[in-house]
Amino acid sequence: MTKRIDSSLLYTALVVLLLLGVVHRSNARPRVNRPPGFMRFISNATDFASEDYYDYIIVGGGTAGCPLAATLSQSFRVLLLERGGVPYNRPNVMSHDGFLTTLTDVNNFDSPAQSFISEEGVPNARGRVLGGSSAINAGFYSRADKQFFENSGLVWDLSSVNQSYEWVERAIVFRPQLRTWQTAIRDALLEVGVHPFNGFTLEHKVGTKIGGSTFDRTGRRHSSADLLRYARSSNIRVAVYATVERVLLASSPSVSGSNVSAIGVVYRDQLGRFHHALIRDRGEVILSAGALGSPQLLFLSGIGPRSYLSTWGIPVALDQPHVGDFVYDNPRNGISIVPPVPMENSLIQVVGVTEDGAFLEAASNVIPFASPLHSVFIRAPASPLYVPVTTIMEKILGPVSIGLLRLASTDVRINPVVRFNYFSDPQDLERCVNGTRKIGEILRSRAMQDFMIREWFGNRRFRFVGAPLPVDQSNDLVMADFCRRTVSTIWHYHGGAVVGKVVDSDLKVIGVNSLRLVDGSTFNISPGTNPQATLMMLGRYMGLKMLRERMR
C-alpha cells in the first residue's frame, strides 16, 4: 500500500511540476552539422580496391587511431579502417543533449554505440563510429596522473607527451560553462574538504577542479575524428564500414629473432566483399581497435594461448599465453535524485580527486518519464513528460581487480565475452567505501539543500531514483554491500594486451614483426579521471615516435 501511495504522489508531483514549468526540455533544434573538409579522403569500404598497398595500416578509427593516422600521414601512405560510419551526419552523436540517446539507441549492425554486458551482468558500451568512444562519451577531458606514467611500463619522453597533449587540445578541447548542478557540486566538494580548489585545469591534481570538455559552447561534440584535419590528404585514405576479419601473418625468419611477421589485413565491406590491404617494405599493421577489439583480433589472427585457440579451430601463428588477460574496468557507484528545481542537461565538468583514490563526479539530465499508473482524470499527453534527474558518482583509482576476455564467436562482429571481477581485490572495495562515504558527506552539505524536497512540518529529504545510500554509512560491511549491489561502469575499461605481457615498451607485439598495438588494451591502469585525453595523446605521441624511427 505504501509503495502505491508513493508512486501516485510521485506521478502527481511530476504533473504539477510540468504545469508549473519546472520540468522542461530544451526546444532548441539540433544544429546542422556540416561535414568537415577532410571528409574528402573518407570513403565507404565498398569503394576500395580488392587489394592495395600502404606503409601503415591502422585498424580502428577511434580515440587513438585517428590522431595516429593523421600524424603518420605526414610522411607515409596510411590506410585507416573503421568498422562504423562517420559521426557528422548523426545529430545525437554530435550534440551534448544526445548523449543518453546515443548510448541507448543501439542495434547489432551500425549504431555508433555497440552495447555489451559483462559476465557479472553490468551493461557497457563501445564505440562503433569514426572517433570511437570519444564520439559517444560524456566529453570530460583531463590529463593522466603521475602514477599512470610511472606504472605504464613505457619510457616516456615527457616533453613529447606535453606537446602531444597540446596538439590535441588546440583542436578539440574547451572550457565548460558551469550552470546550476555543476556549480553546486563544486561548492559541495569544497565544503566537505576536497581541497584545494584548482580552478580550471587540464592537469590531474588532488582537490576540486573544473576540467576540459570536448563539447564547445554550442553543445557540439568534437571527437578524435576531428584530429584528421591535421592529416596530409594526399597520403591518407579512411575506409568506413570496413570490418577487419584478421591480421595476415607470414613466416619470416629475421634478425630480430621473430619468425612471424604481419603483412596486412583482410577486411569486409557492407556488401560482404573481402579486401586485402598489404604493407610495403618496413611498413606496419597497427591495431587501435580498443580494449575489446584488439585482443579479439589477436585471437582471430592466431595469436594467443595455443590450447585455447585450438578449441576454436583457429590455426596458431604464435603461442602467446597472456592475450585477453589482465583486463580491468573502473567500477562506478553513486546515487541519483529528482530535484524540485529547474535543471539543465550537464555532463561531467567538475571533479573531486581525493587523497584515498576516489574521483567524484556528477551529471544532470532531463529525461522522459513514463508512469505505470493510468488515470481517468489525466489524458495521455501528446508529448512525454520530462523529468530532471541529477547524479553524483564516484570512480576508483586503478582498479586492482583483474578480469579476463575470451571469444564468444569466431565472427569478429560479435562482442567477446568479458568478466571484470569487480571488487575481487579488497583494495578496490575499500576505495569504493571511502568514495561513497564522501558522496554521503556531499548530500549533507549546505550546497545540496536546494535539491531536497520539502515535506510537512518542515522536514526535507531527497527523492532518490534507484538505491539510496545506506542509512548507517559508518558500517564498513553495509557500505561494501552497497558497492557490490550498485556497481556499474564508467566506460573506462582497459587492458587485455598489456605492456610487458603481450607488447613491449614500444607497443610492438612480442614475437611478431611489423605488428603494434596503440590503444587502451595496453594499459594496466586507467589514466586520471578520464582516459580519452591520454589515448588521443598516445596516438599523436606514438606517431611522432614512429616517424623518428623511420628517419634513422
Swiss-Prot record:
Residues annotated as signal peptide: 1-28
Reactions that this protein is recorded to catalyse: (R)-mandelonitrile = benzaldehyde + hydrogen cyanide
Post-translational modification: Glycosylated.
Binding-site residues, FAD: 55-82
SUPFAM superfamilies membership: FAD-linked reductases, C-terminal domain, FAD/NAD(P)-binding domain
Keywords noted in UniProt: FAD, Flavoprotein, Glycoprotein, Lyase, Signal
UniProt keyword annotation of Aminoacyl-tRNA synthetase present: no
Active-site residue list: 492 (proton acceptor)
GO molecular function: flavin adenine dinucleotide binding; mandelonitrile lyase activity; oxidoreductase activity, acting on CH-OH group of donors
Known EC number: 4.1.2.10
Cofactor field: FAD
Gene3D superfamilies (UniProt xref): 3.30.410.40, FAD/NAD(P)-binding domain
Glycan-modified residues: 44, 162, 259, 434
InterPro entries: FAD/NAD-bd_sf, GMC_Oxidoreductase-Related, GMC_OxRdtase, GMC_OxRdtase_N, GMC_OxRtase_C
Keyword Oxidoreductase assigned: no
Protein family according to the UniProt entry: Belongs to the GMC oxidoreductase family.
Subunit structure: Monomer.
Protein name: (R)-mandelonitrile lyase-like
